[in-house]
Amino acid sequence: MVIANDEYSIWRTAPDASRLCYQHFCWRELYKSNIHPSIDLTNRPNLRIAELATGHCLWAIQVAEEYPHAQVEASDISLGLMPPKPDLPANLAVRKWSFFDPVPEEWIGAFDLLHVRLVIQPFGGNQDPRSVLDKFVSMLKPGGYLQWDEYDYHNADKNNVYSANDPVLVPNPEVTHNSSTKVWKLIMKTFQWPTEHFDRLADYFSAAGLTDVAAHKKRPPPAVFRAFYEHWYALVAQLLPVLDSMDAGAGQEAKELLMQMKKDAVVDGVYSAHITKFVVGRKPEQ
């Protein structure tokens, strides 16, 4: 199933704005930085940084503040979650753009760093992301970096990780309290999110001509492990009406699993999170 642009209105609500802000600070805590430590932006004149599918624009705002000498650009198919323009840093420009559309001419070969995060949903219907990846690569300067942040979607039963308040009482939560894993698989299947394609992003980076490619995987640290769980719970709850409209049976199953997830946490002290993955590659110097 391919989700049309007008259907994204569900993601432009106040609850989603709050969830996305929460998500941003959880991810920032992973490396205490917005930009992966392997990326070196020193000694780059006319530094330009872009974030695509920016949502609430927090990543771009913070990067613009961290790099006041850089020109930062943020884009999305809707600007509805962004702060008012007068509140944005002077070195941050925003515009409406979908990465399924042709790349603006002025963006070809323009950026030292291009960032995108958690964009599997628009590729519903098991769409191949490689044509979009080629656009991203075309937007990089020679020597420019692409940072693409996702969860480690493939084999969700192996990449869901758990934490229990009482490991003696609950020694194998991935077996006894796996409602989170089940709802994860159900959502991936119903929306036909292309998990296998996204699992191969590092290979696709290399095939697209990027070098120094690495997929940096990291378990959420204790400081934000429960926060990642709470964010996942909020996302599932927000997806329920859409899921129910697509498949009533899947919607009902998801509701029951969501109730079990809450019981797992509140009663048994078991929380689940997903392995995060930062895929980084660099365009060769000419």
What is each of the regions a protein language model found here?
Residues 7-9, 174-178, 182, 214-274:
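C-terminal helical/coil "lid" or tail adjacent to the Rossmann-like core of SAM-dependent
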Residues 113-120, 149:
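Residues lining the SAM
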Residues 130-142:
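A short glycine-rich, Lys/Arg-flanked "PGG" loop and its adjoining helix->strand segment in the class I
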Residues 208-211, 274-286:
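Core SAM-dependent methyltransferase catalytic element
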Residues 46-105, 131:
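Class I SAM-dependent methyltransferase SAM/SAH-binding core
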Residues 1-46:
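Class I SAM-dependent methyltransferase Rossmann-like catalytic core
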Residues 141, 145-233:
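Conserved catalytic/acceptor-binding region of the Class I
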Residues 103-114:
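A short acidic, Gly/Pro-enriched loop at the edge of an enzyme's catalytic core
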